[in-house]
Amino acid sequence: MQNAIKDTEQKSYTTLNNCVACGGSNLEKFLDLAEQPLANNYHDGSGAGDSFQLGLNLCTDCYHTQLPVSVNPTAMFDHYLYVTGTSQTLRDYCDWFAQFVTDREQLTHGNILDIACNDGTQLDSFRKLGWKTFGVDPAKNLFEIALEKGHMVRNAYWPISYPQMDVITAQNVCAHTPNPLEFLEGVKASLTAKGTAYIQTSQSQMYQRNEFDTTYHEHISFFSANSMKTLAERAGLVLTDIHITPIHGDSYVFVLKHQGADVQSSVTETIRKEGTEGRHTENFYRMFGLNARSIVEKLKDLVTKCQAEGTPVVGYGAAAKGMTVLNANDIQLDWIVDDNELKQGLLTPGTNIPIKDRSSLDIDKHIVVVPLAWNFFDEIRSNVEEVREGKST
Protein backbone atom coordinates (compact mmCIF):
# COMPACT_ATOMS: atom_id res chain seq x y z
CA MET A 1 0.00 0.00 0.00
CA GLN A 2 3.00 2.28 0.41
CA ASN A 3 3.07 3.28 -3.27
CA ALA A 4 -0.67 3.90 -3.27
CA ILE A 5 -0.31 6.22 -0.29
CA LYS A 6 2.47 8.17 -1.99
CA ASP A 7 0.30 8.52 -5.11
CA THR A 8 -2.50 10.14 -3.10
CA GLU A 9 -0.47 12.31 -0.73
CA GLN A 10 -1.10 15.43 -2.81
CA LYS A 11 -4.82 14.77 -3.30
CA SER A 12 -7.62 13.35 -1.22
CA TYR A 13 -8.68 10.59 -3.61
CA THR A 14 -7.75 8.71 -6.78
CA THR A 15 -10.15 7.53 -9.48
CA LEU A 16 -9.90 3.78 -10.08
CA ASN A 17 -10.01 3.41 -13.86
CA ASN A 18 -8.77 -0.18 -13.88
CA CYS A 19 -9.80 -3.36 -12.11
CA VAL A 20 -7.55 -3.81 -9.09
CA ALA A 21 -7.80 -7.61 -9.40
CA CYS A 22 -7.07 -8.34 -13.07
CA GLY A 23 -5.88 -4.92 -14.27
CA GLY A 24 -8.52 -4.66 -17.00
CA SER A 25 -10.30 -1.44 -17.97
CA ASN A 26 -13.80 -2.78 -18.69
CA LEU A 27 -15.67 -1.34 -15.71
CA GLU A 28 -19.43 -0.83 -15.52
CA LYS A 29 -21.18 1.21 -12.82
CA PHE A 30 -24.13 -0.60 -11.19
CA LEU A 31 -24.58 1.04 -7.76
CA ASP A 32 -24.72 4.77 -7.03
CA LEU A 33 -24.87 5.87 -3.38
CA ALA A 34 -24.08 9.52 -4.18
CA GLU A 35 -21.35 11.41 -2.35
CA GLN A 36 -20.83 10.48 1.30
CA PRO A 37 -18.40 11.39 4.08
CA LEU A 38 -16.01 8.74 5.34
CA ALA A 39 -18.09 6.24 7.30
CA ASN A 40 -15.86 6.26 10.37
CA ASN A 41 -15.46 10.04 10.60
CA TYR A 42 -17.44 10.37 13.83
CA HIS A 43 -17.05 13.87 15.21
CA ASP A 44 -17.78 16.12 18.17
CA GLY A 45 -19.69 18.71 16.19
CA SER A 46 -16.82 19.97 14.09
CA GLY A 47 -18.06 18.10 11.01
CA ALA A 48 -17.14 14.90 9.20
CA GLY A 49 -14.93 16.45 6.55
CA ASP A 50 -15.11 15.98 2.79
CA SER A 51 -17.53 13.71 0.97
CA PHE A 52 -16.55 11.41 -1.87
CA GLN A 53 -18.31 9.46 -4.57
CA LEU A 54 -19.62 6.12 -3.30
CA GLY A 55 -20.88 3.24 -5.39
CA LEU A 56 -19.72 0.09 -7.12
CA ASN A 57 -18.27 -0.79 -10.52
CA LEU A 58 -18.19 -4.25 -12.09
CA CYS A 59 -15.18 -5.57 -14.00
CA THR A 60 -16.77 -7.45 -16.89
CA ASP A 61 -13.54 -9.39 -17.44
CA CYS A 62 -13.05 -11.12 -14.06
CA TYR A 63 -16.29 -10.09 -12.29
CA HIS A 64 -14.51 -8.27 -9.53
CA THR A 65 -16.45 -5.39 -7.95
CA GLN A 66 -14.87 -2.25 -6.55
CA LEU A 67 -15.40 1.37 -5.62
CA PRO A 68 -15.05 4.08 -8.28
CA VAL A 69 -12.52 6.02 -6.17
CA SER A 70 -9.85 5.33 -3.57
CA VAL A 71 -9.70 7.84 -0.73
CA ASN A 72 -6.26 8.60 0.71
CA PRO A 73 -5.73 5.72 3.19
CA THR A 74 -4.13 7.96 5.80
CA ALA A 75 -7.45 9.81 6.17
CA MET A 76 -9.16 6.58 7.18
CA PHE A 77 -6.65 4.43 9.01
CA ASP A 78 -4.06 6.55 10.85
CA HIS A 79 -6.50 6.89 13.77
CA TYR A 80 -9.09 4.13 13.75
CA LEU A 81 -12.12 3.72 16.00
CA TYR A 82 -13.12 0.18 15.04
CA VAL A 83 -11.84 -2.01 17.88
CA THR A 84 -12.00 -5.79 17.46
CA GLY A 85 -12.09 -6.54 21.17
CA THR A 86 -15.30 -4.53 21.73
CA SER A 87 -17.51 -7.36 20.48
CA GLN A 88 -17.90 -10.68 22.28
CA THR A 89 -18.92 -12.18 18.95
CA LEU A 90 -15.59 -11.15 17.43
CA ARG A 91 -13.59 -12.32 20.44
CA ASP A 92 -15.21 -15.74 20.18
CA TYR A 93 -14.55 -15.81 16.45
CA CYS A 94 -10.89 -14.95 16.95
CA ASP A 95 -10.55 -17.94 19.27
CA TRP A 96 -12.23 -20.18 16.71
CA PHE A 97 -10.10 -18.86 13.85
CA ALA A 98 -6.84 -19.37 15.75
CA GLN A 99 -7.81 -22.98 16.46
CA PHE A 100 -8.87 -23.45 12.82
CA VAL A 101 -5.48 -22.28 11.54
CA THR A 102 -3.57 -24.26 14.16
CA ASP A 103 -5.40 -27.48 13.28
CA ARG A 104 -4.74 -26.98 9.56
CA GLU A 105 -1.08 -26.10 9.94
CA GLN A 106 -0.23 -28.69 12.58
CA LEU A 107 1.96 -26.08 14.28
CA THR A 108 1.85 -24.87 17.86
CA HIS A 109 5.05 -22.87 18.13
CA GLY A 110 5.28 -21.28 14.71
CA ASN A 111 5.58 -17.62 13.78
CA ILE A 112 2.39 -15.85 12.78
CA LEU A 113 1.94 -12.35 11.36
CA ASP A 114 -1.45 -10.64 11.50
CA ILE A 115 -1.69 -7.78 9.01
CA ALA A 116 -3.93 -4.97 10.29
CA CYS A 117 -3.85 -6.57 13.72
CA ASN A 118 -6.02 -3.84 15.28
CA ASP A 119 -5.91 -4.07 19.10
CA GLY A 120 -4.25 -7.50 19.00
CA THR A 121 -7.36 -9.52 19.83
CA GLN A 122 -6.66 -12.09 17.11
CA LEU A 123 -3.02 -12.31 18.17
CA ASP A 124 -4.18 -12.92 21.75
CA SER A 125 -5.99 -16.03 20.55
CA PHE A 126 -2.95 -17.33 18.67
CA ARG A 127 -0.63 -16.71 21.61
CA LYS A 128 -2.86 -18.80 23.88
CA LEU A 129 -2.19 -21.70 21.49
CA GLY A 130 1.58 -21.27 21.65
CA TRP A 131 2.31 -19.17 18.55
CA LYS A 132 4.92 -16.41 18.41
CA THR A 133 2.82 -13.40 17.51
CA PHE A 134 3.72 -10.54 15.17
CA GLY A 135 1.54 -7.76 13.85
CA VAL A 136 1.36 -4.69 11.64
CA ASP A 137 -1.22 -1.92 11.92
CA PRO A 138 -1.29 1.68 10.62
CA ALA A 139 -3.48 3.07 13.42
CA LYS A 140 -1.24 4.44 16.15
CA ASN A 141 -3.99 4.28 18.78
CA LEU A 142 -4.58 0.56 18.13
CA PHE A 143 -0.95 -0.36 17.54
CA GLU A 144 -0.16 0.88 21.05
CA ILE A 145 -2.84 -1.38 22.57
CA ALA A 146 -1.48 -4.45 20.78
CA LEU A 147 2.07 -3.53 21.76
CA GLU A 148 1.13 -3.20 25.43
CA LYS A 149 -0.22 -6.75 25.29
CA GLY A 150 3.27 -7.98 24.48
CA HIS A 151 2.88 -8.74 20.79
CA MET A 152 5.72 -7.82 18.43
CA VAL A 153 3.90 -5.15 16.44
CA ARG A 154 4.95 -2.46 13.98
CA ASN A 155 3.04 0.74 13.25
CA ALA A 156 2.98 0.81 9.45
CA TYR A 157 1.00 0.19 6.28
CA TRP A 158 1.52 -3.12 4.54
CA PRO A 159 3.62 -4.08 2.61
CA ILE A 160 6.84 -3.55 4.50
CA SER A 161 10.06 -5.54 4.68
CA TYR A 162 9.41 -8.32 7.18
CA PRO A 163 11.05 -11.60 8.27
CA GLN A 164 9.50 -14.71 6.73
CA MET A 165 6.57 -16.19 8.62
CA ASP A 166 5.03 -19.66 8.81
CA VAL A 167 1.55 -18.16 8.62
CA ILE A 168 0.21 -14.75 7.61
CA THR A 169 -3.36 -13.74 8.38
CA ALA A 170 -5.13 -10.72 6.93
CA GLN A 171 -8.73 -10.31 8.01
CA ASN A 172 -10.78 -7.64 6.26
CA VAL A 173 -7.76 -5.67 5.07
CA CYS A 174 -6.78 -6.89 1.59
CA ALA A 175 -10.13 -5.59 0.37
CA HIS A 176 -9.33 -2.20 1.92
CA THR A 177 -6.20 -1.57 -0.12
CA PRO A 178 -6.08 0.44 -3.37
CA ASN A 179 -3.35 -1.91 -4.62
CA PRO A 180 -4.13 -5.49 -3.55
CA LEU A 181 -1.57 -6.80 -6.03
CA GLU A 182 1.21 -5.03 -4.15
CA PHE A 183 -0.36 -6.26 -0.91
CA LEU A 184 -0.19 -9.93 -1.95
CA GLU A 185 3.29 -9.54 -3.42
CA GLY A 186 4.35 -8.41 0.06
CA VAL A 187 2.66 -11.47 1.54
CA LYS A 188 4.51 -13.73 -0.89
CA ALA A 189 7.86 -12.18 0.05
CA SER A 190 7.20 -12.74 3.76
CA LEU A 191 6.04 -16.38 3.60
CA THR A 192 8.37 -19.29 4.25
CA ALA A 193 8.66 -21.82 1.42
CA LYS A 194 5.86 -23.94 2.91
CA GLY A 195 4.04 -21.02 4.51
CA THR A 196 0.34 -20.28 4.25
CA ALA A 197 -1.61 -17.04 4.00
CA TYR A 198 -5.21 -16.77 5.15
CA ILE A 199 -6.90 -13.81 3.46
CA GLN A 200 -10.37 -13.12 4.85
CA THR A 201 -12.84 -10.88 3.05
CA SER A 202 -16.27 -10.09 4.44
CA GLN A 203 -19.79 -10.39 3.03
CA SER A 204 -19.27 -13.34 0.69
CA GLN A 205 -23.04 -13.40 0.13
CA MET A 206 -23.58 -9.64 -0.11
CA TYR A 207 -25.02 -9.74 -3.63
CA GLN A 208 -27.31 -12.68 -3.00
CA ARG A 209 -28.60 -11.01 0.20
CA ASN A 210 -28.76 -7.38 -0.99
CA GLU A 211 -26.12 -6.32 1.56
CA PHE A 212 -25.31 -3.09 -0.24
CA ASP A 213 -24.65 -1.35 3.08
CA THR A 214 -21.24 -2.97 3.30
CA THR A 215 -20.20 -0.50 0.60
CA TYR A 216 -18.16 2.32 2.11
CA HIS A 217 -14.88 4.01 1.34
CA GLU A 218 -12.74 1.65 3.42
CA HIS A 219 -13.99 -1.35 1.43
CA ILE A 220 -12.44 -0.75 -1.97
CA SER A 221 -12.88 -4.32 -3.21
CA PHE A 222 -15.50 -7.04 -2.98
CA PHE A 223 -13.75 -10.21 -4.01
CA SER A 224 -15.34 -13.19 -5.65
CA ALA A 225 -13.54 -16.53 -5.71
CA ASN A 226 -12.74 -15.91 -9.36
CA SER A 227 -11.27 -12.44 -8.84
CA MET A 228 -9.17 -13.57 -5.85
CA LYS A 229 -7.82 -16.48 -7.91
CA THR A 230 -6.91 -14.04 -10.67
CA LEU A 231 -5.21 -11.63 -8.26
CA ALA A 232 -3.29 -14.37 -6.45
CA GLU A 233 -1.87 -15.67 -9.72
CA ARG A 234 -0.75 -12.18 -10.72
CA ALA A 235 1.09 -11.96 -7.38
CA GLY A 236 2.85 -15.29 -7.93
CA LEU A 237 0.71 -17.20 -5.43
CA VAL A 238 -1.90 -19.91 -5.85
CA LEU A 239 -5.38 -20.04 -4.33
CA THR A 240 -5.42 -23.53 -2.80
CA ASP A 241 -8.60 -23.62 -0.72
CA ILE A 242 -11.69 -21.57 0.16
CA HIS A 243 -13.73 -21.61 3.34
CA ILE A 244 -16.82 -19.61 4.25
CA THR A 245 -17.10 -18.62 7.91
CA PRO A 246 -20.17 -17.21 9.71
CA ILE A 247 -18.79 -13.77 10.57
CA HIS A 248 -19.49 -10.35 9.01
CA GLY A 249 -22.41 -11.67 6.98
CA ASP A 250 -20.43 -14.81 6.06
CA SER A 251 -16.83 -14.26 5.03
CA TYR A 252 -14.53 -15.89 2.54
CA VAL A 253 -11.28 -17.26 3.92
CA PHE A 254 -8.96 -17.62 0.93
CA VAL A 255 -5.99 -19.92 1.55
CA LEU A 256 -2.92 -18.93 -0.47
CA LYS A 257 0.41 -20.69 -0.89
CA HIS A 258 3.45 -20.53 -3.11
CA GLN A 259 3.08 -21.86 -6.65
CA GLY A 260 3.19 -25.63 -6.96
CA ALA A 261 0.97 -26.30 -3.94
CA ASP A 262 -1.99 -28.66 -4.27
CA VAL A 263 -5.34 -27.03 -5.06
CA GLN A 264 -8.46 -28.30 -3.29
CA SER A 265 -11.76 -28.89 -5.09
CA SER A 266 -13.33 -26.05 -3.07
CA VAL A 267 -11.76 -23.52 -5.45
CA THR A 268 -13.39 -24.74 -8.67
CA GLU A 269 -16.60 -25.60 -6.81
CA THR A 270 -16.93 -22.09 -5.37
CA ILE A 271 -16.25 -20.43 -8.71
CA ARG A 272 -18.81 -22.70 -10.38
CA LYS A 273 -21.38 -21.92 -7.67
CA GLU A 274 -20.87 -18.18 -8.12
CA GLY A 275 -21.50 -18.65 -11.82
CA THR A 276 -24.74 -20.58 -11.33
CA GLU A 277 -25.95 -17.85 -8.94
CA GLY A 278 -25.55 -15.31 -11.72
CA ARG A 279 -22.43 -13.55 -10.49
CA HIS A 280 -20.78 -13.87 -13.89
CA THR A 281 -23.50 -11.83 -15.62
CA GLU A 282 -23.90 -8.06 -15.79
CA ASN A 283 -27.68 -8.05 -15.25
CA PHE A 284 -27.23 -9.71 -11.84
CA TYR A 285 -25.42 -6.61 -10.59
CA ARG A 286 -27.80 -4.14 -12.24
CA MET A 287 -30.69 -5.74 -10.33
CA PHE A 288 -28.68 -5.50 -7.12
CA GLY A 289 -28.34 -1.74 -7.62
CA LEU A 290 -32.09 -1.32 -8.15
CA ASN A 291 -32.89 -3.37 -5.04
CA ALA A 292 -30.52 -1.26 -2.95
CA ARG A 293 -32.31 1.94 -3.91
CA SER A 294 -35.67 0.39 -3.05
CA ILE A 295 -34.45 -0.68 0.42
CA VAL A 296 -33.20 2.77 1.47
CA GLU A 297 -36.41 4.41 0.29
CA LYS A 298 -38.57 1.95 2.25
CA LEU A 299 -36.46 2.37 5.39
CA LYS A 300 -36.77 6.14 5.27
CA ASP A 301 -40.55 5.86 4.87
CA LEU A 302 -40.73 3.54 7.90
CA VAL A 303 -38.57 5.77 10.11
CA THR A 304 -40.52 8.88 9.13
CA LYS A 305 -43.85 7.13 9.86
CA CYS A 306 -42.76 5.93 13.32
CA GLN A 307 -41.40 9.32 14.31
CA ALA A 308 -44.56 11.05 13.10
CA GLU A 309 -46.49 8.78 15.47
CA GLY A 310 -44.24 9.82 18.36
CA THR A 311 -42.16 6.64 18.51
CA PRO A 312 -38.39 7.14 18.85
CA VAL A 313 -36.36 5.18 16.29
CA VAL A 314 -32.95 4.17 17.63
CA GLY A 315 -30.08 2.59 15.73
CA TYR A 316 -27.89 -0.02 17.41
CA GLY A 317 -24.30 -0.16 16.28
CA ALA A 318 -22.58 2.94 14.89
CA ALA A 319 -21.05 0.71 12.24
CA ALA A 320 -19.76 1.90 8.90
CA LYS A 321 -22.45 -0.09 7.11
CA GLY A 322 -25.07 1.82 9.05
CA MET A 323 -23.57 5.13 7.99
CA THR A 324 -23.84 4.06 4.35
CA VAL A 325 -27.57 3.37 4.71
CA LEU A 326 -28.32 6.57 6.61
CA ASN A 327 -26.36 8.84 4.28
CA ALA A 328 -27.72 7.17 1.14
CA ASN A 329 -31.12 8.73 1.78
CA ASP A 330 -30.55 11.24 4.63
CA ILE A 331 -32.29 9.02 7.19
CA GLN A 332 -32.50 10.74 10.59
CA LEU A 333 -32.71 8.42 13.61
CA ASP A 334 -33.28 9.84 17.10
CA TRP A 335 -30.00 8.46 18.41
CA ILE A 336 -27.65 5.51 17.97
CA VAL A 337 -26.39 3.11 20.64
CA ASP A 338 -22.86 1.76 20.45
CA ASP A 339 -20.85 -0.25 22.97
CA ASN A 340 -17.53 1.21 21.82
CA GLU A 341 -16.62 3.91 24.34
CA LEU A 342 -14.48 5.66 21.72
CA LYS A 343 -17.63 6.48 19.74
CA GLN A 344 -19.95 7.41 22.61
CA GLY A 345 -20.60 11.15 22.85
CA LEU A 346 -19.76 11.73 19.20
CA LEU A 347 -21.99 12.45 16.20
CA THR A 348 -22.35 10.33 13.09
CA PRO A 349 -20.73 11.53 9.85
CA GLY A 350 -23.12 13.33 7.54
CA THR A 351 -26.36 12.76 9.46
CA ASN A 352 -25.00 14.14 12.79
CA ILE A 353 -26.95 11.69 14.96
CA PRO A 354 -25.77 11.46 18.60
CA ILE A 355 -24.12 8.20 19.73
CA LYS A 356 -24.91 7.00 23.25
CA ASP A 357 -24.27 3.99 25.46
CA ARG A 358 -26.84 1.22 25.85
CA SER A 359 -28.24 2.65 29.10
CA SER A 360 -29.97 5.25 26.91
CA LEU A 361 -32.40 2.50 25.91
CA ASP A 362 -33.72 2.31 29.48
CA ILE A 363 -36.73 4.57 29.00
CA ASP A 364 -40.40 3.78 29.63
CA LYS A 365 -41.54 4.87 26.19
CA HIS A 366 -42.06 2.36 23.35
CA ILE A 367 -39.13 2.51 20.92
CA VAL A 368 -38.15 0.96 17.61
CA VAL A 369 -34.59 -0.37 17.37
CA VAL A 370 -32.87 -0.63 13.98
CA PRO A 371 -29.90 -3.07 14.13
CA LEU A 372 -27.46 -1.12 11.96
CA ALA A 373 -24.67 -3.58 12.78
CA TRP A 374 -26.92 -6.45 11.71
CA ASN A 375 -23.99 -8.88 11.46
CA PHE A 376 -24.08 -8.88 15.28
CA PHE A 377 -27.88 -9.22 15.42
CA ASP A 378 -28.05 -11.91 18.11
CA GLU A 379 -25.71 -9.96 20.38
CA ILE A 380 -27.67 -6.74 19.78
CA ARG A 381 -31.00 -8.41 20.52
CA SER A 382 -29.64 -9.85 23.74
CA ASN A 383 -28.30 -6.46 24.85
CA VAL A 384 -31.58 -4.69 24.06
CA GLU A 385 -33.64 -7.31 25.89
CA GLU A 386 -31.38 -7.06 28.92
CA VAL A 387 -31.70 -3.27 29.17
CA ARG A 388 -35.40 -3.09 28.27
CA GLU A 389 -36.66 -6.10 30.20
CA GLY A 390 -40.45 -5.92 30.35
CA LYS A 391 -40.66 -2.79 28.17
CA SER A 392 -42.18 -2.47 24.72
CA THR A 393 -39.61 -2.55 21.91
Regions found by a protein language model. Give the residues of each.
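A conserved beta-strand element that flanks and buttresses the S-adenosyl-L-methionine
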Residues: 169
